[in-house]
Amino acid sequence: MDKVLNREESMELMDLLGLDRSAWGNIPVMRKAYLKKCKELHPDKGGDEDKMKRMNFLYKKMEQGVKVAHQPDFGTWNSSEVPTYGTDEWESWWNTFNEKWDEDLFCHEEMFASDDENTGSQHSTPPKKKKKVEDPKDFPVDLHAFLSQAVFSNRTVASFAVYTTKEKAQILYKKLMEKYSVTFISRHGFGGHNILFFLTPHRHRVSAINNYCQKLCTFSFLICKGVNKEYLFYSALCRQPYAVVEESIQGGLKEHDFNPEEPEETKQVSWKLVTQYALETKCEDVFLLMGMYLDFQENPQQCKKCEKKDQPNHFNHHEKHYYNAQIFADSKNQKSICQQAVDTVAAKQRVDSIHMTREEMLVERFNFLLDKMDLIFGAHGNAVLEQYMAGVAWIHCLLPQMDTVIYDFLKCIVLNIPKKRYWLFKGPIDSGKTTLAAALLDLCGGKSLNVNMPLERLNFELGVGIDQFMVVFEDVKGTGAESRDLPSGHGISNLDCLRDYLDGSVKVNLERKHQNKRTQVFPPGIVTMNEYSVPRTLQARFVRQIDFRPKAYLRKSLSCSEYLLEKRILQSGMTLLLLLIWFRPVADFAAAIHERIVQWKERLDLEISMYTFSTMKANVGMGRPILDFPREEDSEAEDSGHGSSTESQSQCFSQVSEASGADTQENCTFHICKGFQCFKKPKTPPPK
């Protein structure tokens, strides 16, 4: 090995390998150190390119020399090459052979006797070996409260602590300062080791800091952790038993460095208020709720909608939600807030459908309609009660004993008896079946479904009926073989495949998009269709069928009273509720709303007299504008069925009819078509 490299080259190679000079010639150790240094000094790893080249040159030269030294003929000679001893040739050969060894054979060193050699004896006990001090496994216990104990975490922090040896801490102090451009770094002594504390301008993972430091601590121990309480940790390192060795900022850190000025309190949207508004208005549309709530950000004192007072869902809640709506307008998660509110409405419906009886649910719906009537017909409302009573008169002429029809339907829907839950409205175009079905749907609350689509696409449409009080299968189409004017569709065929849904005997699976399936009894309801042929298997599912016929006087009267269509009075549940209040006795209503029904009967007696309503029906029968009559009050107030009386307005009509039954039909001023009750046009009372 002494001939492989000269002394300067061998010392340089050992320094580059990071090995002690005594390891020269230990090829396995040098090989391991060489591979390790290749990873550190490689330019792709951030190392020194010049050192890498020099180390490769010396190591390759050393390897080549070792191979030559291990060859069989290295250092040997042939006996025939040696001249005869004693001759001049032999002297010359001998000098040449020894000239390379002369400098290595001389050693200019003086040996001094040690104390152990002078005092020790031949039989003395050898000295004990020094015990190896174990490296620490963790930070000192008193610092644990300030450090993060997470081992495998992707959380990033900006303050770190490194626990290592004194020698490595000196190196890491400078390396970390350059590598991460630290805001602050300090080195503290503890026993024979050091603790580094530093703050970085950017956040890093603890594992990234640890991996970088491990490259510089091959044999030395290293513990790296994130710091949760920076100032408390730093102040602890500045007290005994720790000592400050050096720090990047003169005077160190102060407590106020970690206490920034308190920012202004961030205003946050009250999700609870938005949810409360959605529950009060029973809003199930995310975008509708978002739009209505954004309208609240305008000042209530300058709001035109509040001045008109035509939208109860707005002016009744504007002032309460004004402040929260201003914050809501600046929020970035408006849709998430509204989606949660709508989900809460659906959750409320789910709870009500499970815990409330159907009678209680209908009473709650009636209370909702009565509240709405109090608003729109109140002092701040803009609805005209007389126009809604005109709608009552028109609907009452649609079918004989309309109040009884509606009452029987409500009874059927509330009882919800299996196989006796669905009504069929059948008739030609423009006969009024859809108008009545829509009004009943609004009266009870529910959804309208379209089944005129392929059966495989019907699942999500049926899922609309989840947690609903009733449904309406609107305008169901058949084969169209009955008439060329009737279009064909899948409706009747699909309903025939949904017998379990119509019967209500067993629970069925309903599903919506992005929701789990819901198992429940499908809600009862109404089926409307034109004059299609209904199979016997489907006809057996209807407890009652009503055949509608178009009437010219109804169409003519409706065309003269456009407000009924413009304001959708005929399709409103409030119109049917007013019809029930006018015709049915108080005893037919639930006891929970008797007081409110009595109040409305009294109001109708004051504003709409029997004479006025009879004139409205007369105008309907003659195809005239319903409200085209002189506004004159009757001389006597007439009972509407509240208080001690159990009679209703329909009973009053029947008494009038019986009293005038002796008169012939020809003597009547007008006559409503066959099937309806005939009555005389009331005489105009004399002027007061």
UniProtKB/Swiss-Prot annotation:
A GO CC annotation given for this chain: host cell nucleus
UniProt-listed Pfam families: Polyoma_lg_T_C, T_Ag_DNA_bind
Record localization: Host nucleus
Annotated GO MF terms: ATP binding; ATP hydrolysis activity; DNA replication origin binding; helicase activity; zinc ion binding
Extent of motif LXCXE motif: 105-109
Modified residues (N6-acetyllysine): K680
Post-translational modification: Phosphorylated on both serine and threonine residues. Small t antigen inhibits the dephosphorylation by the AC form of PP2A. O-Glycosylated near the C-terminal region.
UniProt region (Disordered), positions on chain: 115-135, 632-658
Keyword Transmembrane helix: no
Residue ranges with Polar residues bias: 642-658
Positions bearing Phosphothreonine: T125, T684
J domain segment(s): 12-75
Listed cofactors: Mg(2+)
Chain ranges of the SF3 helicase domain: 401-561
PROSITE patterns the record matches: DNAJ_2, SF3_HELICASE_1, T_AG_OBD, ZF_LTAG_D1
Extent of motif Nuclear localization signal: 126-133
Function: Isoform large T antigen is a key early protein essential for both driving viral replication and inducing cellular transformation. Plays a role in viral genome replication by driving entry of quiescent cells into the cell cycle and by autoregulating the synthesis of viral early mRNA. Displays highly oncogenic activities by corrupting the host cellular checkpoint mechanisms that guard cell division and the transcription, replication, and repair of DNA. Participates in the modulation of cellular gene expression preceeding viral DNA replication.
Domain notes: The J domain is essential for multiple viral activities, including virion assembly, viral DNA replication, transformation and transcriptional activation.
Protein's name according to its UniProt entry: Large T antigen
